[in-house]
Amino acid sequence: MRPRPPAMRTKRRYILARILPYRARVDQKQMYFAVIEAATSLLGDAAAGLAQPAVVFCEGGYVVVRCRRGTEKDVAVALSTVTAVADERIALRTVATSGTIHALRRRMRSIRQLPGDEEVKIGETYFAVYRYPRQKVDLVEKGIKHQKSLFFTEADLEER
C-alpha cells in the first residue's frame, strides 16, 4: 500500500516544553503517561482522543509533544497541569509550537548548571544550592525524607 500524499495526511503540530526543575531526569514513557493523564483529566476522554497527544522525545530538560492541528492550545494548557512524573515533582512550561520538530530543535538551548556547589542554612534546615543562568537558584533540602525544593534568585540568596 502506498503512503498518502502530503495533502491527504493529518496535519500535526509539535509543542516544545521545558521541564522544571532543570535537574529532573524523566523517562519518556513516564512523561507520556503523565501527559495523557493531564489531557484526559482536563479535556475529557473524547477531546483528548481527538487531540491525540504523544510524547515524541524527552531529553536535555525539554519535552516535545505531538498533537493534531487545531488542538495545540488545549494540549499546551494540559501540559501546564502536569505536576509529577513517576513520583518526581516537576512543572512543564510551554516554550514554542511549530509544525516541524526541526524548528523546535533550533529553539532548544542547553541548560547548564553553573559551578559552585554550596550549602546554606535557612532556619534550622540545611539546603544544597544549585545555580543556573539568569540568576536562578534552586535550594534542595538536605536529608533522606520529606525533601522540599525552594526557588530563589541571587538577590534572595544574598539577603539570607
Curated annotation (Swiss-Prot):
Pfam families for the chain: RNase_P_Rpp14
Q: Name one GO biological process term.
A: tRNA 5'-leader removal
Protein's cellular compartments: Cytoplasm
UniProt-recorded Gene Ontology molecular function terms: ribonuclease P activity
Question: Cross-referenced InterPro entries, in alphabetical order?
Answer: Pop5/Rpp14/Rnp2-like, Rnp2-like_sf
Tell me, in one coarse class, where this protein mainly resides. Answer: cytoplasm
Q: Keyword set for this entry?
A: Cytoplasm, Endonuclease, Hydrolase, Nuclease, tRNA processing
- Put simply, this protein is called Ribonuclease P protein component 2
As recorded in Swiss-Prot or TrEMBL, the protein's gene is named rnp2
